[in-house]
Curated annotation (Swiss-Prot):
Pfam families: GATase, GMP_synt_C, NAD_synthase
Source organism per UniProt: Flavobacterium johnsoniae (strain ATCC 17061 / DSM 2064 / JCM 8514 / BCRC 14874 / CCUG 350202 / NBRC 14942 / NCIMB 11054 / UW101) (Cytophaga johnsonae)
Protein name, as recorded: GMP synthase [glutamine-hydrolyzing]
Listed EC numbers: 6.3.5.2
Reaction(s) the record says it catalyses: XMP + L-glutamine + ATP + H2O = GMP + L-glutamate + AMP + diphosphate + 2 H(+)
Keyword Nucleotide-binding: yes
Amino acid sequence: MQHNVLILDFGSQYTQLIARRVRELNIFCEIFPYNHIPSDLSSYKAVILGGSPFSVRGEDAPHPDLSQIRGKMPLLAVCYGAQYLAHFSGGEVAASNTREYGRANLSYIKEGETFFEGVSENSQVWMSHSDSIKALPTNAVKLASTHDVEYAAYKIEGETTYAIQYHPEVYHSTDGKKMLENFLVKIAEVPQNFTPNAFVDEMVAELKEKLGNDKVVLGLSGGVDSTVAAVLLNKAIGQNLYCIFVNNGLLRKNEFQNVLDQYKGMGLNVKGVDAGDRFLGELAGISDPETKRKTIGRVFIEVFDDESHLLEDVKWLAQGTIYPDVIESVSVKGPSATIKSHHNVGGLPDYMKLKIVEPLRMLFKDEVRRVGATLGIDPELLGRHPFPGPGLSIRILGDITPEKVQILQDVDSVFIEGLKSWGLYDKVWQAGAILLPVNSVGVMGDERTYEKVVALRAVESTDGMTADWVHLPYDFLMKVSNDIINKVKGVNRVVYDISSKPPATIEWE
């Protein structure tokens, strides 16, 4: 994957979005913290400086060393990057009279500029800054303005350096992707050769060379990431890949056997381990959400360790790590504060001494799905909604019992099958049911009931970082609510969660 684009991260919430837009142009890019610029820049064809919550005037402002970049390769500075270049090149940056946040329009665009080829007149852009450039460096030329921002875009004479005070990566910037394409393809001449087919060919060759005849073990979850990783590894090393699919007793209804059969039908060397009783036994009496997660993580490691020891001469542990996980681990400020323990289980015992292989570590989730399609994986598997590693345990509020698991599996099954039959499943990013720790009074026939309450949750999102609740049709909600109450013994009330993230999280625990 040569001819990369290097994106320097200054802590902006939009940095990953820049990378996604660049990847959409079939151009490979990588994100690095501004203070960890690679020493060898020979494989990079262009550099993008991202935005930042900091002010260039602040004492704690990021100050990257751009001596190996400025004037030596094409450079695009976005928002904070544009202000940084202006500030340290002799221009003036000052606090704006009002915070410039939201939509704006380019009222002036300099004619004949390649950067703005194909960009519509009065094009809408997205602003997000509290400082503004008041004067350009003497060697800079204004390229664009808005009503409130005179220097919305500029370039440095004698360099292939461009700077913009808005965010082209945000969807609200209607021609933003076109501007990125103009800079990367027409100005920087970066090849557009990063495609799913190219990735598969290159990664399979890399895995063959790295792994040789070594044996590799991989824990399958039934999710998209581990499934695509397994098929990719299987294509490279065949039966030297040993897959372990553990049933923790907290999967969806009939999921363990159904997914196991699918894996075997795909030709994977997979072993199913039904450890449901062991997990539920360890979870008995535990109500605290974090303790549940850690207990499930610990027991999974124990089960995986037991099964791995039955294999001889395994040297590698494969994981379905994807790029957002990698970026988070080396971010400007380090990993975010722990809101919840991460679903992905790590921390295998040191004595296992396995080397790690992560074939998907440079891909975003949507790219993983496209690679999966290229590999011929069943669209039903690729289109599965995200499902938490701890399974239904964090959708059962309070302690966990086999009876509660059974109820929630049945409710979830009615909900998910209903979404599919109404043609709604693929329009929803994630959906599921939550068993609440309360009973409610009801009437069935002439009998008074006092039974469980369940909540239904359906959200739309692109990456899970933010999410909006889905406005499911009232007729559907009425039908699925009636079906749940009539078909699932022990439930007499259904509610629908209309909270967005933030402030709520997608899962209740």
